[in-house]
A protein has these predicted regions:
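C-terminal terminal-subdomain/extension
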Residues: 56-106
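Compact nucleic-acid interaction/catalytic patches
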Residues: 10-15, 20-55
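Short, flexible segments with low predicted structural confidence
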Residues: 5-6, 40, 66-67
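GIY-YIG nuclease catalytic motif and its immediate N-terminal context
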Residues: 1-10
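Short, conserved beta-strand segments within well-ordered enzyme catalytic domains
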Residues: 1, 33, 68
């Protein structure tokens, strides 16, 4: 869970689960690059930067969700509240592919 408030404009807000996408190898900065998780909506099936996650015992989500890679941001480690789960290798690979789409890296 990550506290994403306060925000400005269309930034995603409130305390919510997120996927940390930055590498631990960069450990010198007190920041993490995160992608927030939000509720699934059928219209997201055609949005290339939304990666669907189904709830399971590894990610510990309680409902069908999506990782919103268009809302990538760096946050202070002080915003990280607790670790609630992980994504699997296949899911993380899909997240990395969606990140490439956001940055135009094909």
């Amino acid at each position: 869970m990550v506290n994403l408030s306060p925000t400005v404009g269309a930034e995603i807000t409130k305390t919510r689960p997120c996927v940390i996408v930055s590498s631990n190898e960069i450990g010198i900065l007190p920041l993490k690059v995160i992608a927030p998780i939000t509720d699934y909506k059928p219209r997201y099936n055609t949005v290339p930067w939304m990666v669907e996650l189904s709830p399971d015992g590894i990610n510990n989500l309680t409902k069908r969700s999506v990782v919103d890679l268009f809302q990538l941001r760096s946050v202070s480690q002080g915003r990280l509240i607790k670790n609630t789960g992980k994504v699997g290798k296949d899911e993380f690979q899909r997240i990395l592919e969606a990140t490439k789409i956001v940055f135009g890296i094909y």
